[in-house]
Amino acid sequence: MRFYYTLLATAAALLVHSDALSAAAETSLNQLTAVDGTTTTSQRFLRRHTDSETTDNEERLNSGPIVLDTAKKIDDLFEVEKLDKILDPKMADKFLDGKTFFGWLDKSALDEALNGNIAQKTKVFEHWREKRLRPKALTKVLTTDPAVRKKYKFVYEMYDSYIKYVARKKLSGLKRNRGD
């Protein structure tokens, strides 16, 4: 019961010291503005109004087209021109000119494996297998330079697949012979 008396006394004290009664008397519902009308205010706006915003438009777009130059910025970010220069196949040819690997593997054999038909590729891969060239060793040699890696990636992946194919074929032949 004391709580209610305390609450009533607090509310009465607040009403006495506030101007709630005078504020209620000043407001009037008779003063209505038009729907399209605007009222002036002396408060500052955070948004700056310009002549282009005279319509009731929520969008703040410029009237002209927006030109984005993101493709150029992305090219600059990744330095695409520099990468193209590094990965140029001509750079791979310059790197491999006059070099032999393992004492017998040269650029002409790599080019034949890259550009030849299936029979030529099989012949080259058989020759490499007879020389006991391991796919990991070939991959290690051909991935030393980025341009060589890009140009001859097909060769070392195909040679690895060829070696696995020959091993599977040999294993299946052994299984057939054992079953007879």
Curated annotation (Swiss-Prot):
Signal sequence bounds: 1-24
Keyword set includes Transcription: no
Intervals of motif RxLR-dEER: 44-60
Induction, per UniProt: Expression is induced in presence of citrus root extracts or during the interaction with the susceptible host.
GO CC terms, sorted: extracellular region; host cell
Top-level taxon of origin: Eukaryota
Main location: secreted
Keyword terms, alphabetized: Secreted, Signal, Virulence
Localization terms from the record: Secreted; Host cell
Family, similarity comment: Belongs to the RxLR effector family.
Function: Secreted effector that partially suppresses elicitor-induced cell death in host and enhances virulence of P.parasitica.
This protein's domain notes: The RxLR-dEER motif acts to carry the protein into the host cell cytoplasm through binding to cell surface phosphatidylinositol-3-phosphate.
Protein name as catalogued: Secreted RxLR effector protein 5
Source organism (scientific name): Phytophthora nicotianae (Potato buckeye rot agent)
